């Protein structure tokens, strides 16, 4: 449907609703095109190369390095969690609203000796919204086709 390398997003249309498939119980995420974040931090959910779900947490605000959010992961009771290869396109969510604010673009090489130095780079959803010269290069035409000004 739409994609743009500027913020590294792709919007796909499914041929069938996963709710109608036996053995699937999908969970749909909301989105938010906010341009600045509160102090609650962020969460990355990913399935690296199709592996079981992983969750990475940051209690800090991501750095705004337009067109990307740069996220340094925080230590939790389970240690450090980082994004892994094969997780590209996975969502970045706010910790308070659990809405998508970015999509994974890349990050640092994993450093097991210094996990606090690991970071991830996410394309900013709000830039994916209207950065592009036609509907095939931006999200607003697909997620708000009536141009209501929706933010989430």
What are these regions (language model features)?
Residues 52-56, 102, 111-113:
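Extended hydrophobic-aromatic, low-complexity segments
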Residues 47, 93, 104-106, 115:
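Broad hydrophobic/π-residue packing in well-ordered secondary structure
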Residues 1-73, 85:
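Serine endopeptidase catalytic core focused on the charge-relay Asp
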Residues 38, 44, 80-83, 96, ...:
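N-terminal hydrophobic or amphipathic segments with adjacent small-residue motifs
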Residues 50, 97-98, 106-109:
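Short, well-ordered loop/turn and helix-capping segments at boundaries between secondary-structure elements
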Residues 74-80:
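Short, well-ordered junction/capping motifs at the entry into regular secondary structure
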Residues 1, 5-9, 16-25, 49, ...:
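C-terminal cap/linker of serine protease catalytic domains
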Residues 81-104:
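Catalytic nucleophile loop of clan PA
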């Amino acid at each position: 449907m739409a994609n743009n390398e500027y913020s590294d997003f792709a919007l796909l249309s499914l041929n069938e609703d996963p709710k109608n498939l036996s053995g699937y119980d999908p969970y749909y995420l909301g989105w938010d095109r906010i341009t600045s974040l509160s102090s609650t931090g962020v969460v990355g959910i990913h399935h690296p190369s199709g592996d079981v779900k992983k969750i990475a947490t940051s209690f800090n605000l991501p750095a705004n390095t337009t067109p990307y959010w740069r996220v340094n992961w925080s230590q939790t009771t389970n240690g450090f969690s980082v994004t892994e290869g094969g997780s590209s396109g996975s969502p970045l969510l706010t910790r308070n609203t659990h809405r998508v604010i970015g999509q994974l673009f890349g990050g640092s090489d994993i450093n097991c000796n210094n996990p606090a130095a690991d970071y991830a780079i996410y394309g900013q959803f709000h830039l994916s919204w209207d950065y592009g010269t036609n509907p095939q290069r931006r999200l607003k035409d697909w997620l708000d086709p009536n141009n209501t000004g929706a933010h989430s």
